[in-house]
Amino acid sequence: MSTAFGERIRQIVSSEGARLRLVPENTASRKPAAETWCKKEVLGHLVDSAANNHQRFVRALLADELLFPAYVQNEWVRAQEYAGESWEGILDLWSALNRHLAHLVDRIPAAKLSMQCRIGENPPMTLEALIGDYIRHLVHHLAQIEAGGA
């Protein structure tokens, strides 16, 4: 089982979630530049990432090899209009999805971590690498939010 991954996700949700809750609604809505995402949209993108990876992680438990479609992040963010949603609502959804992902990855058998997964046209990667990549992606975008832009 991959409890180290789950623990890392829980730690991120706890520490970053507390910081994000201090961000005022108007600050979360402000775009740093016309072509960039506001904090709400960056966090919404992380909701989309959690939702896509939830499906990938569960399906990996049920199969021997997987091919997943890629997702077009800008279109997902635009379609869901995260900028018009409440900061608290997006934050609650992000927190809940990631707590569940932590619960899920805690239960992935070690033997499944070497399973090959393909996402779109990207080269295959193991489930373990996919989980690690998810965590790096999460940390990267949370740092963007903290720095004030996307």
Go through each PLM region and give its residues:
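Short, contiguous alpha-helical
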Residues: 7, 25-75, 102-103, 116-150
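Terminal targeting/low-complexity segments that flank the catalytic cores of oxidoreductases
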Residues: 1-6
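Acidic/histidine-rich alpha-helical segments that form the ligand environment
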Residues: 8-13, 17-22, 77-114
